[in-house]
Design a protein with these regions (language model features):
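Alpha/beta-hydrolase superfamily serine-hydrolase fold, recognizing
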Residues: 16, 20-21, 25, 55-64, ...
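A glycine/proline-hinged amphipathic helix-loop "lid/cap" segment
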Residues: 1-69
Length: 300
């Protein structure tokens, strides 16, 4: 059963969706309009007091480093934003990135990877790996943690896969919230009990077409479902047990455990897709934030 705060948040979100003040990934909207709506809302989010935003650049990508007061020097976090792979940028990531920085006291990078439908697979994957390598070079010897939600969770997993496959230093840990790992249709997302009001199965298919049209959807970098998850770094996963993408998290957990890889995980009842990024907003997301901090501390 969800907390009272979670129920209130869900009611507010659903009311805003009905009135057209908040978007939903159901396949009914113009993707560019949807992007503009979401990014405008994200850019109005409150940022963490005491966090300084330092601009950076990785090739053609705008990037930003959220630096907290009394910043630690022993680790780096990379936050890869979600948004269905069609929206989000370094600036719109400030709300959650600065909260992560404030809570962990670790500097947090965010960056503007290329988005669909203008730039399809593998543009976002290539950009994330480019940014990851640039950050490793800037901070030699420091443990680097990848955190992302939804599409950003997918990209955090794939970035670790590319590091593994290319002999690049691996992340110290990967923290995917509500990841998507299949764009091929192999996983059944229409299970009984699916109560997801944010990302519907139809909306997911629509996003997949925008991102992967004309691509090999069984390429493991497009669908990590087709990777056996061997030699991956430790992971911490969190998701809503009734969301459309719940099965994706379940598959990751199963494969990591089969390979003997550390995998901390928890599913939550009656929440919503990618609720983890509400941070201090609900008891459920606050628990995930504390678990994230503990996971990072254990792997520095």
């Amino acid at each position: 059963m969800a907390s009272e705060q979670m129920e209130q948040l869900k009611m507010a979100m659903q009311m805003m969706m009905k009135k057209g003040f908040a978007p939903t990934f159901d396949g009914s909207a113009d993707p560019i309009q949807l992007r503009n709506t979401i990014q405008a809302a994200q850019e109005r989010m409150v940022t963490e007091p005491g966090v300084t935003f330092v601009p950076d650049q990785f090739g053609d990508m705008d990037a930003e480093l959220s630096v907290p007061e009394n910043s630690r020097e022993d680790a780096i976090i990379i936050y890869i934003h979600g948004g269905g792979l069609i929206c989000g940028n370094a600036f719109s990531s400030r709300g959650y990135a600065s909260m992560l920085a404030g809570e962990t006291k670790i500097p947090v990078y965010a960056f503007s990877y290329r988005l669909a439908p203008e730039d399809k697979f593998p543009a976002a994957v290539d950009d994330c790996f480019t940014a990851y390598q640039a950050i490793l070079k800037k901070h030699p010897g420091k443990p680097v943690f990848l955190i992302g939600e939804s599409g950003g969770a997918y990209l955090s997993i794939v970035t670790a896969m590319k590091a593994r496959d290319n002999g690049v230093t691996m992340p110290a840990g990967v923290i995917p919230y509500s990841p998507v790992i299949d764009v091929s249709g192999a996983l059944n997302r229409e299970r009984e009990g699916n109560k997801d009001f944010t990302v519907t199965p139809d909306g997911l298919r629509w996003l997949q077409e925008l991102y992967c049209v004309d691509a090999d959807v069984k390429n493991p970098y497009a669908s990590p479902y087709y990777d056996d998850m061997h030699d991956m770094p430790p992971m911490l996963l969190a998701w809503d047990e009734s969301e459309t993408l719940a099965v994706d998290s379940e598959v990751i957990v199963e494969r990591l455990e089969k390979n003997g890889i550390e995998c901390r995980h928890k599913s939550y009842p009656d929440c919503f897709h990618a609720f983890a990024t509400t941070g201090r907003g609900t008891p459920e997301s606050m628990e995930i934030l504390k678990d994230t901090m503990a996971f990072i501390e254990d792997h520095i």
